[in-house]
Swiss-Prot record:
Lineage: Bacteria, Pseudomonadati, Pseudomonadota, Gammaproteobacteria, Alteromonadales
One function term, GO molecular function aspect: structural constituent of ribosome
Keywords carried by this UniProt record: Ribonucleoprotein, Ribosomal protein, RNA-binding, rRNA-binding
GO biological process, one term: translation
Subunit-structure text: Part of the 30S ribosomal subunit. Interacts with proteins S7 and S18. Binds to IF-3.
Pfam families in the cross-refs: Ribosomal_S11
Descriptive protein name: Small ribosomal subunit protein uS11
Role according to the record: Located on the platform of the 30S subunit, it bridges several disparate RNA helices of the 16S rRNA. Forms part of the Shine-Dalgarno cleft in the 70S ribosome.
Origin species: Shewanella amazonensis (strain ATCC BAA-1098 / SB2B)
HAMAP family named among the record's database cross-references: Ribosomal_uS11
């Protein structure tokens, strides 16, 4: 029987990205932070729910801060330095997520609000009566 040449396990080389984009989706119930390269390929992501917050604690600014920190630290392996931030949604974690990305050590070059605004499309949810 012929001996199969063993391949040495190759270490996967992470691509180095200098500039990236951070997409923050802040809904009333959760906050999702995705860090991508310039083409939109995801490098890392984190959510408030995945960071250990459940129920109504997911929708707090602190939960959004923790999620942004986790996504930011995970993306540092790619050598990111500058971030362009896109914020979508009306949630309570909008500002705290941006502050957390700044605290991780990224230079934020631009902040853009990309919240979709309907031109009188779908009917909105009814008003809450508490």
């Amino acid at each position: 029987m012929a001996k199969v040449p063993s391949r040495s396990p190759r270490k996967r080389v992470r691509k180095q990205v200098a500039d990236g984009m951070a997409h923050i989706h802040a809904s009333f119930n959760n906050t999702i932070v995705t860090i991508t390269d310039r083409q939109g390929n995801a490098l890392s992501w984190a959510t408030a729910g995945g960071s250990g917050f459940r129920g109504s604690r997911k929708s707090t600014p602190f939960a959004a801060q923790v999620a942004a920190e986790r996504a930011g630290v995970a993306a540092q392996d790619y050598g990111l330095k500058n971030l362009e931030v896109f914020v979508k949604g009306p949630g309570p974690g909008r500002e705290s997520a941006i502050r957390a990305l700044n605290a991780v050590g990224y230079k934020i070059t631009n902040i853009t609000d990309v919240t979709p605004i309907p031109h009188n499309g779908c009917r909105p949810p009814k008003k809450r009566r508490v």
